[in-house]
Amino acid sequence: MRWSAYWTRALARRLIRRLLAGDGGDRLQPRWLPRRWVTVVSGDIDPDAGVAVLWVVSRPGHESAVSYSMAFERCGEEWTSTGGGSSSSDAAAVRRRLPVGSTGQLGMIELGGGGGCPSRAHLLQHPDDWMSAPWVGSNTLQVAAEVDHLVVGERRIEVPANGTLVVAWKAPPSTVRGGVRPRIAAIGADGTELAVLGPRDQMDSHTWARVLGD
């Protein structure tokens, strides 16, 4: 409970400020915060859409390690939590990045878990208008070593050294439960588009090509 309160009220707010200042990717870990206590796995923010997501692991490498994720939306001047989760795993903190096609990294972009909810900012202004509320969502991704960065919708997102990250997004109102995730493209160091994960895809285009080729 103590950690949960600190995570939501103090650390998360500091990390959001760092994201707003442009300190994403591997720069998101505060220098004053030892990784052996808390490892900041990933964070993402879309200031224009007013959405953010954070992922940290407490006590990585220890039997009591816990992974925490939490999504946020800007409501007025405040960043408000829209939900999150935890699990007894530190895999994201200790994972090393793997080349595509290897055991544990079949595709350029591996889609992990995700979640979301109707926009709270919209519902604060229009409490009875659920049908017109945008969807605020997030997803975890595992990216191959060949990928330099991602393009999520129109945004460029840096990939952390271990290739594991979270992305935040906001989608227009939709009849599809859970909203429609934006297009995600994996880009190589030379600017080549290596693979695409479409809005409704569970596998990226590189993986599909290998499956159909076999």
Functional labels for PLM-detected ranges:
Residues 156-174, 191:
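Glycine-centered loop-to-beta-strand initiation motif
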Residues 149-154:
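Short, surface-exposed beta-strand/strand-loop-strand elements in extracellular ectodomains
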Residues 1-142, 175-214:
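Serine/threonine-biased, Pro/acidic-interspersed low-complexity stretches characteristic
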Residues 142-148:
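Short proline/glycine-enriched turn/loop motifs at strand-loop junctions of beta-rich domains
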